[in-house]
Amino acid sequence: IFYDAPSCRDNKQNQDEEGIDCGGTSCTYLCSVGVQKPSTRFVRPFAPAAGRTDVIAYIDNPNMNAAAKGGRFTIELYGTDGTVLARKQGTVDLPPASTVPVYVPNFVSGYIEVARAFVSYDEPTFKWFRYTDNRIVPTYNNDAEVTGTTAPRITASLTNPSAKALRDVLVIATVFDSAGNAIAATQTVAPTIPAQGTATVVFIWNEPFSTPPARVDVVPIIPLPSP
């Protein structure tokens, strides 16, 4: 007689699980009925140069103690007649109680008029797990400086609070006007942020902003560990 001990990978609801291989104190992953779905704070297409469209989206995780790693999403761009002009898929890590920017450069090429954008989520790929956020995340010092008008340039700094250098940190910048609307976005990589030190990041555009900038979000992206 062979006995298979209950586990969180046996496709059965056992132990103290609240569903099949989820929930309870035994399993890493939470049941979908116990968590809130991701939502889109906003998604906005831009034309930073003639014949090119970029997209910035802010994705919210409303769950205070749950994270998801590598959840899949789809962004669609629609024309003025309601037809889909372009579609792209991507993945995102959502720390607990977070808003994560997703920037997609050169989403579509060509001289087309984009009326709106939409984000949808492949909900089964958002496998939620309990997580206390202990990642080392550099701090944006809220010191963005905008210079230039025909080819704007933004300089900002990030501080590393840890005793270990951080390397190849993706950083996304989003520019907002006085009404709170996103008017531009781009990204760069900070090669090194020294231990307990500061590094400067620079963001460059080749065309003027559509309206005067009033605020800049600078967000470093640190991947979640695997559960």
Regions found by a protein language model. Name each.
Residues 93, 99-150, 184-187, 202-227:
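Terminal connector regions
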Residues 51-66, 124-185:
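Surface-exposed interaction/gating patches
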Residues 42-47, 141-146, 191:
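Short beta-strand segments of immunoglobulin-like
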Residues 54-58, 72-74, 101-103, 118, ...:
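Beta-strand secondary-structure signal
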Residues 18, 64-101, 162-200, 211:
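Extended intrinsically disordered, low-complexity coil regions enriched in Ser, Thr, Gly, Ala
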Residues 3, 28-37, 126-135:
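Proline/serine/threonine-rich low-complexity linkers at boundaries of modular beta-sandwich domains
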Residues 19, 26-81:
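Extracytoplasmic/periplasmic/luminal assembly and interaction segments
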Residues 1-34:
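Cysteine-rich modules of extracellular adhesion/ECM and protease-associated proteins
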